[in-house]
Amino acid sequence: MPELPEVETVRRGLQPFMEGATVVRVEQNRPDLRFAFPENFAERLSGRRIEALGRRAKYLTVHLDDGLSIISHLGMSGSFRIEAEDAQGLPGGFHHERSKNSLHDHVVFHLMRPDGASARIIYNDPRRFGFMLFAEKGALEEHPLLKDLGVEPTGNLLSGEVLAALFKGRRTPLKAALLDQRLIAGLGNIYVCEALWRPGLSPMRAAGSVAGEMDVMERLAGAIRSVIAQAIAAGGSSLKDYIQADGALGYFQHSFSVYGREGKPCRNPACGGTVERVVQSGRSTFFCASCQT
C-alpha cells in the first residue's frame, strides 16, 4: 500500500495539472470502489474549479471553489495517470509495480487548465480498494476519516518531546505505536522499519520503555523525519523518470537498510549482523537483532 511519501509525491505530480484547472466533465465508470461514490459524484464536480491539492496522512484532498472537498485514498493498487500535452506518466513511485491496464480506469477527470490546455487525470485501481468521498464545505477537518489523525511526521512538528508524550505508559511495541495513525499520521510498514533501524531501536521493544530517554526520542524523531524527507525526494526523482519512461520504479527502495533484505548483511558498518524478518500483527518486520535493541 502506498505510504505517505508516495502519496505526497502523487500530490506534487498532480498539482501542476490540477490546481487552477476547471473540471469540464467526469467519467465515472462504476458505482463504487471500496465504498460507493457519493451521490451525483460526476455532476457535482462538473464546472468546478480546483483551488488546491492537499494531503493529510495517506489521504489526498482536492479543494474546490464551492467549498466542497474530495478525500481520496489509493488503497492497495490505486494510481493516477496524467494525459496532457506536456506530460504523460504515473506520478509517484512505489516499491511495488502498479497497473497501467485501461480496463481498470474507473474515473477520468477532464480538465481545462488556466493556460487553455486540456488534461485528463485518470484513476486506475485493479483491486478497487481505494475510494473517493466528499467532505462538505467547512466539514473537512471533522470528517470521520481525518478528525482523529495524529501529528504529521514531516517538518518540525514531530519532535522527541512529542514522541515521549505519545509513548508514555504504552506497553505496545514500538513498531505498533509508530503505525498507530491516532498517534502519528501517515507512517506505514516500510518507513517504520527503516526509521527504527537508524537509531538502533528494536521494533519489539515496548514504546513506554523508551519514553523517558529524551536523547533516544530525539534520535528516533530525527530518523522518522529524515526517512520520510529522503523518500519524498526519491519519489520526486522517480516522477521525472515516469514522464520519460512510463512505469519505472522510484529510487528509495535502492536505499533500504532493512526492508525486504532478510538474510542480507546489516548496512551498519560497525555491526556485522544479518537482517531478520518477523511477523508483527500480521505484517512483516525487518530489523537487525545485533544492532537494534
UniProtKB/Swiss-Prot annotation:
Keyword Methyltransferase: no
UniProt EC number: 3.2.2.23, 4.2.99.18
Residues in FPG-type zinc fingers: 257-293
SUPFAM superfamilies in the record: Glucocorticoid receptor-like (DNA-binding domain), N-terminal domain of MutM-like DNA repair proteins, S13-like H2TH domain
SMART domains per UniProt: Fapy_DNA_glyco, H2TH
Purpose of the protein: Involved in base excision repair of DNA damaged by oxidation or by mutagenic agents. Acts as a DNA glycosylase that recognizes and removes damaged bases. Has a preference for oxidized purines, such as 7,8-dihydro-8-oxoguanine (8-oxoG). Has AP (apurinic/apyrimidinic) lyase activity and introduces nicks in the DNA strand. Cleaves the DNA backbone by beta-delta elimination to generate a single-strand break at the site of the removed base with both 3'- and 5'-phosphates.
InterPro entries the record matches: DNA_glyclase/AP_lyase_DNA-bd, DNA_glyclase_Znf_dom_DNA_BS, Formamido-pyr_DNA_Glyclase, FPG_cat, MutM-like_N-ter, Ribosomal_uS13-like_H2TH, Znf_DNA_glyclase/AP_lyase, Znf_FPG/IleRS
Family, similarity comment: Belongs to the FPG family.
Catalytic machinery residues: 2-3, 58, 283
One record GO biological process: base-excision repair
Keyword Acetylation: no
Catalysed reactions listed for this entry: Hydrolysis of DNA containing ring-opened 7-methylguanine residues, releasing 2,6-diamino-4-hydroxy-5-(N-methyl)formamidopyrimidine; 2'-deoxyribonucleotide-(2'-deoxyribose 5'-phosphate)-2'-deoxyribonucleotide-DNA = a 3'-end 2'-deoxyribonucleotide-(2,3-dehydro-2,3-deoxyribose 5'-phosphate)-DNA + a 5'-end 5'-phospho-2'-deoxyribonucleoside-DNA + H(+)
Binding site for DNA: 104, 127, 170
Keywords for the protein's UniProt record, in alphabetical order: DNA damage, DNA repair, DNA-binding, Glycosidase, Hydrolase, Lyase, Metal-binding, Multifunctional enzyme, Zinc, Zinc-finger
Assembly with partners or alone: Monomer.
Full protein name: Formamidopyrimidine-DNA glycosylase
Cofactor note: Binds 1 zinc ion per subunit.
CC cofactor: Zn(2+)
